Amino acid sequence: MAILDVLSFPDERLRTVAKPVEEVNDEIKQLVSDMFETMKDENGIGLAATQVNRHVQVVVMDVSEDQNEPRVFINPEITRKDGSTISEEGCLSVPGNYAKVERAEAITVKALDQNGEAFELDAEGLLAICIQHELDHLKGKLFIDYLSPLKRQRIRKKLEKEARLAAKA
């Protein structure tokens, strides 16, 4: 297992659209394992392969309080959206920034698990929000894309400044 580097906005690689996984093989299983380790190391609840510069449709998450309900979504697709909710979101690729985002309140998602078995899941609340957030990453979209251009620009400038300061240190 390995901890992978998480890309940070405004890195253009975060805008790459992920390709479907052709076969759930040992390489994909290793990626899933590494992504879980990376997510836990970063204290996250979800991670898309795009965020670790692997452009395949793989998402891992665990929204449980005890971090003991790991979920894997390979080639995920949302087949139903119901209702609307607004909640504050953050992202490992946009560190230290949070904003209110409107999402569907309840969803149904179909995907493959880490063994390549198909499943369908009805989700609501935090799980539904997290799934939608992570699936956006697979399309090259970030939660800040839902914000006004002015707010997005402020976040970009702040993160660019932090990166410059870190590079000097």
Curated annotation (Swiss-Prot):
Annotated binding of Fe cation, by residue: C91, H133, H137
Keywords assigned: Hydrolase, Iron, Metal-binding, Protein biosynthesis
InterPro entries: Peptide_deformylase (IPR023635), Peptide_deformylase_sf (IPR036821)
GO biological process: co-translational protein modification; translation
Catalytic reaction equation(s): N-terminal N-formyl-L-methionyl-[peptide] + H2O = N-terminal L-methionyl-[peptide] + formate
MF terms (GO), sorted A to Z: metal ion binding; peptide deformylase activity
Family matches, as Pfam families: Pep_deformylase
Keyword Hydrolase set for record: yes
EC number: 3.5.1.88
Cofactor(s) this protein cannot do without: Fe(2+)
Catalytic residues of the enzyme: E134
Coiled-coil positions: none
Cofactor binding mode and count: Binds 1 Fe(2+) ion.
HAMAP family hit by this protein: Pep_deformylase
NCBIfam families associated with the record: pept_deformyl, PRK00150.1-3
Family, as annotated: Belongs to the polypeptide deformylase family.
Function field: Removes the formyl group from the N-terminal Met of newly synthesized proteins. Requires at least a dipeptide for an efficient rate of reaction. N-terminal L-methionine is a prerequisite for activity but the enzyme has broad specificity at other positions.
PANTHER family reported in the protein's UniProt record: PEPTIDE DEFORMYLASE
Protein's name in the database: Peptide deformylase
